[in-house]
């Protein structure tokens, strides 16, 4: 299972008023995703990036039956939950905690926050959706209380069907998230400057 391997950057946790949890994609690294921070309006944030064992949060597509991705998926969700609980113990309120993920990390980000919906600082998902062979509404509880959420994706995308992105946005909106969802025609499986600009405007603008 996943070891607790956390890389930090940005402001010291002891001094920061906000913290951003960053989740890398399949085959990526914590250092990798931390490099994205230089393009975001997060200069006064502490940055926390867990490293997935073997660089992968779960083995199969996020659209596979959930049991196929176990026990890795539960372990990955547990890693994120441990990070959040550690931050709360250090004095951060949940509305001071932000999340960002790309691809597999975006799926994990969305899955974690929607299973534990509350007022967070904000959420950014670059190409991702809720996990499972279908949406399981019974897995999700809580209320986002207008937490700003940005979801950007390509149509088509080789890993993430746009229909799942729409379904994910609807679940988040039902839980009172303030969702900005943008679908880019033929963008490819990547992060673009426009997505970064939109994420900065919608989520990292306080």
Description of each model-found segment:
Residues 2-94:
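Serine-hydrolase catalytic machinery in alpha/beta-hydrolase-like enzymes
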Residues 26, 166-169, 173, 177-206:
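C-terminal catalytic histidine-bearing segment of alpha/beta-hydrolase fold enzymes
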Residues 33-36, 137, 161-171:
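Short alpha-helix in the alpha/beta-hydrolase fold that links the catalytic acid
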Residues 35, 111-115:
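Active-site signature of alpha/beta-hydrolase-fold catalytic machinery across serine-
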Residues 99-101, 126, 152:
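Short beta-strand immediately N-terminal to the catalytic nucleophile in serine-hydrolase-like folds
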Residues 100-105, 109:
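Gly/Ala-rich beta-loop-alpha elbow adjacent to hydrolase catalytic centers
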Residues 118-131:
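A conserved short beta-strand
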Residues 149-153, 157:
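Short beta-strand/loop motif that positions the catalytic acidic residue
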């Amino acid at each position: 299972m996943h070891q607790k391997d956390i890389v930090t950057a940005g402001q010291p946790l002891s001094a920061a008023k906000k913290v951003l949890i960053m989740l890398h994609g399949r085959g990526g690294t914590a250092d990798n995703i931390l490099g994205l921070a230089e393009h975001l309006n997060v200069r006064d944030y502490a940055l926390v990036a867990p490293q997935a064992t073997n660089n992968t949060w779960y083995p199969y597509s996020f659209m596979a039956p959930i049991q196929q991705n176990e026990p890795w998926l539960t372990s990955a969700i547990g890693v994120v939950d441990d990070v959040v609980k550690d931050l709360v113990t250090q004095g951060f309120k949940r509305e001071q905690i932000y999340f960002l993920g790309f691809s597999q990390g975006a799926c994990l980000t969305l899955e974690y926050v929607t299973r534990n919906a509350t007022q967070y600082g904000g959420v950014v998902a670059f190409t991702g959706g809720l996990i499972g062979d279908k949406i399981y509404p019974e897995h999700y509880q809580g209320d986002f209380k207008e937490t700003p959420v940005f979801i950007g994706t390509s149509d088509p995308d080789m890993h993430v069907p746009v229909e799942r992105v729409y379904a994910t946005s609807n679940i988040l909106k039902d839980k009172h998230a303030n969702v900005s969802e943008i679908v880019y025609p033929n963008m490819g499986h990547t992060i673009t400057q426009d997505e970064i600009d939109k994420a900065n405007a919608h989520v990292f603008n306080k």
